[in-house]
Amino acid sequence: MIQMQSMLDVADNSGARSVMCIKVLGGSHRRYAGVGDIIKVSIKEAIPRGKVKKGDVYNAVVVRTRKGVRRQDGSLIRFDRNAAVLLNNQHQPIGTRIFGPVTRELRNDKFMKIVSLAPEVL
């Protein structure tokens, strides 16, 4: 459950380390984002010589949340940290590698590129 001012880890090799959610996209009064939702983020920490720099604003898709994802069979998949993958304006990932597991729900949300790059799909 991600809202404005939430801090997230970055799960790709774009050069960003942590980002802050500045807007949840998809509706004028939408408050929360979950796994598979697109948010607007600001880069708060970045490595030198990365593809992005501190202060830049990007779209991102949420790939892991502490709140978790409820499955149809009643199981709940939750993670230790909130994480996102940075996207360009065409909603394609900026990085070429994905770190850590992602959930199968991303497959339904047209993020097959992220699912195929991820080392593990839960």
UniProtKB/Swiss-Prot annotation:
Pfam families: Ribosomal_L14. GO terms for molecular function: large ribosomal subunit rRNA binding; structural constituent of ribosome. InterPro entries: Ribosomal_uL14, Ribosomal_uL14_bac-type, Ribosomal_uL14_CS, Ribosomal_uL14_sf. Keywords: Ribonucleoprotein, Ribosomal protein, RNA-binding, rRNA-binding. GO terms for biological process: translation. GO terms for cellular component: cytosolic large ribosomal subunit. Part of the 50S ribosomal subunit. Forms a cluster with proteins L3 and L19. In the 70S ribosome, L14 and L19 interact and together make contacts with the 16S rRNA in bridges B5 and B8. Belongs to the universal ribosomal protein uL14 family. This is Large ribosomal subunit protein uL14. It comes from Tolumonas auensis (strain DSM 9187 / NBRC 110442 / TA 4). The lineage of its organism: Bacteria, Pseudomonadati, Pseudomonadota, Gammaproteobacteria, Aeromonadales. The gene is rplN.
